[in-house]
């Protein structure tokens, strides 16, 4: 399992997922991850670095979306291997789930019911974090959980 997820629980220390909203620069991303990691170690906080390689949900077509998956994968690898920090990012398509090298895969709220995307995320064997869509009631998320379980997810 993933180190970050093993540290979660009511009887465990505080956990945070933090990082820049969008991937803008490799050096900046590593600097942010390093600084957050040091601060979390100082205060004994469980930490996972989050960064979006593509903000596909921008309101305007002119909005900055990120540097893309290929460059982001290099940064995620560096942060995990050099800093020892777990990583997480959103995926928007099944093929992205299949190749992304983060420790954890996150499904964005607006895509939380997409069956093929959920299946692809589960098939990676990684922890999957699904954000609740604003259009769903809390009890409707049971259907999302049922989909995950139907693909063999048991975390």
Residue ranges and their predicted role:
Residues 1-75:
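Conserved N-terminal beta1-alpha1 strand-loop-helix module at the mouth
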Residues 13-17, 54-56, 97-99, 124-125, ...:
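A short alpha-helix capping/helix-coil boundary motif
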Residues 16-19, 47-51, 87-89, 105-107, ...:
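Hydrophobic faces of well-ordered beta-strands that scaffold small-molecule active sites
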Residues 37-41, 76-81, 122, 145-149:
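Surface-exposed amphipathic alpha-helices with a cationic face
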Residues 51-106, 112-118:
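N-terminal active-site wall of soluble small-molecule enzyme domains
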Residues 59, 102, 107-155:
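Conserved anion-binding
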């Amino acid at each position: 399992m993933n180190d970050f997820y093993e540290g979660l629980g009511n009887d465990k220390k505080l956990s945070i997922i933090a990082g820049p909203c969008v991937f803008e620069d490799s050096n900046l991303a590593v600097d942010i991850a390093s600084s957050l990691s040091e601060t979390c170690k100082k205060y004994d906080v469980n930490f996972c670095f989050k960064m979006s390689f593509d903000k596909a949900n921008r309101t305007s077509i002119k909005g900055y979306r990120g540097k893309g998956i290929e460059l982001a994968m290099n940064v995620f690898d560096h942060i995990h291997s050099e800093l020892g920090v777990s990583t997480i990012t959103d995926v928007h398509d099944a093929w992205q789930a299949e190749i992304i090298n983060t420790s954890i895969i996150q499904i964005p709220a607006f895509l939380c019911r997409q069956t093929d995307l959920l299946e692809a995320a589960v098939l990676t064997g990684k922890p999957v974090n699904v954000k609740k869509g604003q259009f769903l009631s809390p009890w409707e998320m049971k259907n999302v959980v049922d989909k995950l379980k139907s693909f063999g997810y048991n975390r």
